[in-house]
């Protein structure tokens, strides 16, 4: 189904949340809901103390009752507390104060925002000026708040005839720490909002069904981004253009589908032309049946998520352009649909990649590496400073780590270390696996330069 045939407009993301800075006593703040932190074992933050004093010890009474203890992410709503201007006070557990790092700050903000939004408060104020996050300043905390607010406000309803009720919360304010500069906090709020919307863009693309989110749909979304942001240049390669470049590996995946493959290139030029870019490459298999090596029927509907690497690249490029970051970044999306059909690639077929290497396709369900290898070869023309590819690979990674950790392989330990640290803080953790030459012989083929699978020992 095409973009226009789907009945869906190009994405305009997503919430209409507004963010601001408010100062003053938390007991006097005009808001539908004021959020105050309580540390583990009921130790009150400065803001909670102020509210407790104004409300005739309302918070202390709840803690003494045993209903709330301040564990990380714990919440307790107080309606119409006496002596407080806000209609509601939300107690938010901060856990161990000395352990409040970026990761735990993200967790408590998620919990607080979900509880505040569930209360149907239209305006929410985070009274957090005394809160210190290890290794971070007050501006960082405000930015993370805006990011988590956008993510928490997301709901998928594009293909439902009856739309669920919209999130009531529309304005979020924060009291920054006393040492924070107002302009820094405002900039951080804006960047946090943009980051959250980038995450939601990726989630929305992933959630759309495969008959709507096709390679052509992804290309249309990228083109719309290019029209919206002057820093972006978007180029979409057709199958004929890819064939002229020798991308036989990528094209072998789409051979059985009526949906044309697309190579989508999004360039953000935020630095000097001479500055080498970083390159992001995303696997965009918009639906993966496995091809002739057909997957089992159970759970196949979830194979619409096989383009989430591409969705991540799209969301990241949108955020980079919105922030006007002073770097050069190239996003490359290899988009294809993997279907069985009379023209589909068969096990044992040999294809030639853009690099000139021949590949024996022993399993058509190992298609991600086939689309990515040509995209990675294409990326070489940019002489990049770094290349990061993002892909839903493989089932073995899920068997190894479950749903809690991403598998990561890298030939650059410094880059890997940076990505691992970012993953810990963003709650999107990864674990580095070995990338040793010892494994190369497992891909030997009797008939081609390389096989696309390494067998049960790989």
Language model features: what each stretch is:
Residues 12-284:
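Short amphipathic alpha-helical segment within the helicase RecA-like ATPase core
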């Amino acid at each position: 189904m095409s973009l226009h045939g789907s009945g869906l407009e190009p994405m305009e993301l997503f919430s209409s949340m507004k963010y601001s800075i408010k100062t003053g006593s938390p007991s006097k703040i005009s808001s539908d809901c004021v959020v105050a932190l309580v540390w583990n074992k009921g130790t009150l933050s400065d803001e909670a103390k102020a509210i407790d004093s104004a409300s005739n010890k309302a918070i202390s009474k709840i803690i003494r009752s045993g209903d709330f203890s301040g564990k990380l992410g714990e919440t307790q709503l107080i309606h119409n507390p006496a002596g407080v201007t806000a209609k509601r006070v939300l107690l938010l557990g901060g856990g161990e104060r000395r352990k409040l790092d970026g990761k735990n700050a993200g967790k408590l903000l998620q919990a607080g925002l979900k509880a505040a939004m569930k209360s149907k408060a239209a305006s929410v104020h985070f009274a957090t000026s005394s809160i210190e996050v290890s290794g971070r300043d007050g501006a960082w905390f405000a930015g993370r708040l805006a990011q988590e607010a956008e993510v928490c406000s997301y709901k998928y309803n594009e293909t439902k005839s009856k739309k669920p009720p919209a999130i009531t919360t529309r304005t979020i304010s924060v009291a920054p720490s006393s040492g924070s500069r107002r302009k820094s906090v405002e900039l951080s709020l804006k960047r946090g909002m943009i980051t959250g919307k980038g995450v939601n863009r990726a989630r929305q693309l992933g959630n759309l069904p495969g008959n709507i989110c096709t390679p052509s749909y992804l290309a249309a979304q990228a083109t719309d981004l290019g029209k919206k942001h002057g820093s972006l240049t978007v180029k979409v390669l057709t199958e004929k253009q890819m064939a002229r470049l020798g991308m036989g590996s990528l094209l072998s995946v789409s051979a059985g589908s009526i949906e044309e493959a697309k190579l989508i290139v999004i360039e953000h030029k935020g630095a000097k032309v001479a500055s080498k870019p970083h390159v992001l490459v995303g696997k965009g298999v918009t639906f993966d049946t496995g091809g002739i090596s057909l997957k089992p029927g159970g759970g196949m509907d979830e194979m619409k998520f096989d383009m989430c690497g591409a969705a991540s690249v799209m969301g990241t490029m949108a955020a980079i352009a919105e922030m006007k970051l002073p770097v050069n970044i190239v996003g490359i999306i290899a988009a294809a649909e993997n279907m069985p059909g009379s023209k589909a690639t068969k096990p044992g077929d040999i294809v030639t990649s853009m690099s000139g290497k021949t590949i024996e396709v022993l399993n058509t369900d190992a298609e991600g590496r086939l689309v990515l290898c040509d995209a990675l070869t294409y990326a070489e023309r940019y002489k990049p400073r770094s290349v990061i590819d993002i892909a839903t690979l493989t089932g073995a990674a899920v068997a190894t780590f479950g749903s809690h950790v991403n598998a990561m392989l890298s030939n650059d330990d410094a880059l890997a270390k940076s990505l691992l640290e970012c993953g810990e803080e963003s709650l999107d953790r990864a674990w580095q696996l070995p990338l040793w030459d010892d494994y190369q012989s497992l891909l030997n083929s009797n008939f081609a330069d390389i096989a696309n699978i390494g067998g049960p020992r790989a």
